[in-house]
Regions:
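Extracytoplasmic small-molecule ligand-binding "clamshell" domains
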Residues: 1-53, 57
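Bilobed "Venus flytrap"/periplasmic-binding protein-like clamshell domains
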Residues: 1-16, 74-145, 160
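Second-shell loop/turn segments in exported
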Residues: 2, 100-108, 133-134, 149-152, ...
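Extended ligand-binding regions for polar small-molecule ligands
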Residues: 7-14, 84-87, 172-245
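Short, hydrophobic alpha-helical packing/hinge segments within bilobed ligand-binding/sensory domains
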Residues: 31-35, 140-146, 152, 161-162
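Acidic, polar ligand-binding/catalytic clefts
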Residues: 34-95, 106, 116
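A ligand-binding cleft/hinge motif common to bilobed small-molecule-binding domains
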Residues: 45-58, 117-121, 148-149, 153-187
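Short beta-strand->loop
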Residues: 59-74, 129-132, 166-198
Length: 246
């Protein structure tokens, strides 16, 4: 879960940098983008897509979150595209053309943009592919609810979100089918259904106005985080293939 990653990283920083006061702030994607533009933060933890989008403002990555299951920082996250299982007419990406879709936020790389990128890879214009796209103001459960209730034909989320929401809402289990579901060792390790290529994971970045000495201490702290020391087995590495995000 995103909350597990955030809590693990921040708690580790607080424990290993006692001389640094860390003020936690939680933002939605659009709010964080505004905070970066205004220089209101020194560091941020965001998706690799968000990091790439913020590069023009001088941000630099100082670590990518990895786990025991996904030690390669270039291949950590994926998207899931899903429909109701009883929609026999929707079995492939091409079948989704002209349908209504729903996701969390148009600027969210993991929940929305990865899925739209997969549609482009299939040869379609993502800007004209769906008849309508609705958004839930960053509430993933409402994406699932809308597809379950038939208010939207297609849902787009980050991989593993669907399973997590189903676990909290058992009446939705076995109600959905994943479009273009990937199979193989990566899928087995992830333990979740997904529809897209994999991309770099959560990225810890520093702003250009942050003092270098402070950045050094934070970077050293991040790199000292070991899977065996964290509840969810997270560590920090460095992604090298942000070209896939573009």
């Amino acid at each position: 879960r995103v909350e597990d990653i955030q809590e693990t990283v921040l708690s580790h920083l607080e424990e290993t940098t006692p001389g640094i006061v860390i003020e936690r702030r939680r933002y939605k994607t659009s709010e964080l983008a505004e905070a970066v533009r205004k220089g209101e933060v020194e560091f941020f933890l965001g998706s690799s897509g968000f990091f790439v989008e913020m590069r023009p403002y001088g941000v630099r990555d100082i670590g990518t979150i990895v786990s025991r299951s996904f030690p390669d920082p270039n291949q950590c996250v994926a998207g899931v595209i899903f429909v109701r299982r009883d929609r026999a007419d929707l079995k492939s990406i091409s079948d989704l053309a002209g349908q209504t879709a729903i996701s969390t936020d148009p600027r969210n790389f993991m929940t929305f943009q990865i899925g739209m990128g997969e549609i482009k890879k299939e040869g379609f214009n993502p800007d004209k592919f769906f008849r309508r796209i609705d958004f839930t103001n960053s509430v993933p459960t409402e994406v699932v609810r809308s597809v379950a209730d038939g208010r939207a034909d297609v849902g787009l989320l980050r991989a593993c979100m669907l399973e997590a929401i189903e676990a909290r809402n058992p009446h939705w289990q076995n109600l959905f089918r994943v479009i273009g579901e990937k199979k193989g060792p990566r899928a087995d390790r992830l333990g979740c259904r997904y529809s897209t290529d994999m991309y770099p994971g959560w990225t810890f970045a520093v702003m250009p106005h942050t003092p270098p000495i402070l950045t050094r201490h934070v970077a050293i702290s991040l790199l000292s985080m070991r899977p065996e020391d964290t509840p969810s087995g997270f560590a920090v590495s460095f992604a090298t293939n942000y070209a896939s995000v573009n």
